[in-house]
């Protein structure tokens, strides 16, 4: 078991949603998903524009909610960056804000801090959805059908191309 798996296991507490793209909050009947990306791990500033960085963060969260049957409604955005990269951080934030607004998602909060490298985190919360309509990987069974509408594997290919 690698360190990432150990950290995840540390917080599992028999939670049936760990490992799925989203968690279903039965009290509010909403899906929630969060992802983070960091400079020099998920993107290289020499190879990615502010728009591409924002797009990567947005799409990873947006697709998690949609693939689980939900429609994003609210967003929380966190960004950490060094002062010398503040113009780039602002550009990434503006691009992300435009994607969020275009999809009629309301930004309800977040945080900004300083750090050595750029760190971005986005959390999306869906509109209300009935539990019976939620699609979770943990509920998949042998012989379930999977439909792909676009090419897959480009995220990994892009990552391998960076280093």
Where are these regions (language model features)?
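Helix-biased detector of long, well-ordered alpha-helical tracts
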Residues: 1-163
């Amino acid at each position: 078991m690698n360190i990432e798996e150990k950290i995840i296991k540390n917080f599992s507490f028999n939670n049936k949603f760990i490992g799925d793209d989203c968690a279903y909050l039965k009290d509010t009947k909403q899906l929630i998903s969060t992802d983070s990306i960091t400079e020099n791990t998920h993107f290289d500033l020499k190879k990615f524009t502010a728009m591409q960085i924002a797009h990567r963060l947005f799409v990873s969260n947006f697709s998690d909610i949609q693939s689980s049957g939900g429609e994003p409604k609210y967003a929380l955005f966190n960004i950490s960056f060094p002062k010398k990269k503040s113009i780039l951080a602002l550009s990434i934030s503006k691009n992300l804000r435009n994607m969020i607004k275009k999809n009629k998602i309301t930004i309800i909060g977040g945080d900004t801090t300083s750090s050595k490298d750029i760190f971005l985190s986005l959390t999306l919360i869906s509109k209300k959805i009935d539990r019976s309509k939620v699609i979770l990987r943990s509920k998949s069974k042998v012989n379930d059908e999977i439909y792909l509408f676009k090419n897959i594997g480009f995220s990994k290919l892009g990552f391998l191309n960076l280093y």
